[in-house]
């Protein structure tokens, strides 16, 4: 004996009403469940995300470089002819847990109305553009405003009011032009006024501290009231980072601003660092595999570690040095736009800086 609704319009109305209600409810529950899953994934990250190994993953890279409008030519290795693809496919796998997956919508919703500023040299540019591409891959049709000025760039995702800023500074401490010439002031950080009022700050410095001769951007270093034609670069780095730490202690309100420091990014100009003394990063197609990187821990890392331990305000140290040392294959090398020579200090995009941002994302939302 069958059941029929023929001739009963009120039944049809309530049937379709409850059907629609169930569909909407299922959608809401699904969205809520997805957000809950992201939260659980982030909250579960109670391990050392910075110790692990690189694994090949066919699902990588996390975005298409041809569809991201923010990549500078010097980082867009595929566009400028890099023939191999394996360097795009490596995912960082921590030893005792899994690194949370990046969710661009979750990031935008959690950071709605906030300002995130990267402060540092061209490696900060590397990381800023990476984060912009990661987010854009989730909302490719959303409206954005990109403004580039000398020393400062900002990218705003309009619908969410999220702004990614980049403040370019080679040393964090001040570099001024005076009567005697260009003076690197190891105990002055007046430019820090530009960093105040941010919701998140991500700092970086080291790359330029080692430059000499014609690529050295200063003529004198100033410490106190004394000028120096030069000094041990590690000593200078320590003095500069100590000045930065004093600025953090004096001006950062942890209830309003989260502070990160992206650690020392290694170079791969010297093949002896990984047991190939005749080579550099050029033509490298695989990461270094081994229990310990032969090049050892950079002294800059030791200095940065010392400075971090003396901070009175909370700063999240993204300790990317060890995992980045393994990626001798991930540099632009000869595929760096119109930049001549062999670039073994910056990184291809997509590439290693995406992992830096996964670590930033994981730390930001689990802290």
From Swiss-Prot:
Family: Belongs to the PC-esterase family. TBL subfamily.
Entry's localization field: Membrane
Name the UniProt record assigns to this protein: Protein trichome birefringence-like 39
Topological category with respect to the lipid bilayer: Single-pass type II membrane protein
Claim: Membrane is one of the keywords in the record: yes
Keyword annotations of the record: Membrane, Signal-anchor, Transmembrane, Transmembrane helix
Regions crossing the membrane: 7-29
Functional summary from the UniProt entry: May act as a bridging protein that binds pectin and other cell wall polysaccharides. Probably involved in maintaining esterification of pectins. May be involved in the specific O-acetylation of cell wall polymers.
Superkingdom assignment: Eukaryota
GO MF entries: O-acetyltransferase activity
Comment field (misc): Contains 2 motifs that are conserved in esterases, but it is unlikely that this protein belongs to the catalytically active pectin esterases.
Disulfide bonds: none
UniProt cross-references to InterPro entries, sorted A to Z: TBL, TBL_C, TBL_N
Position of sequence motif GDS motif: 120-122
GO cellular component: membrane; plasmodesma; vacuole
Gene designation per UniProt: TBL39
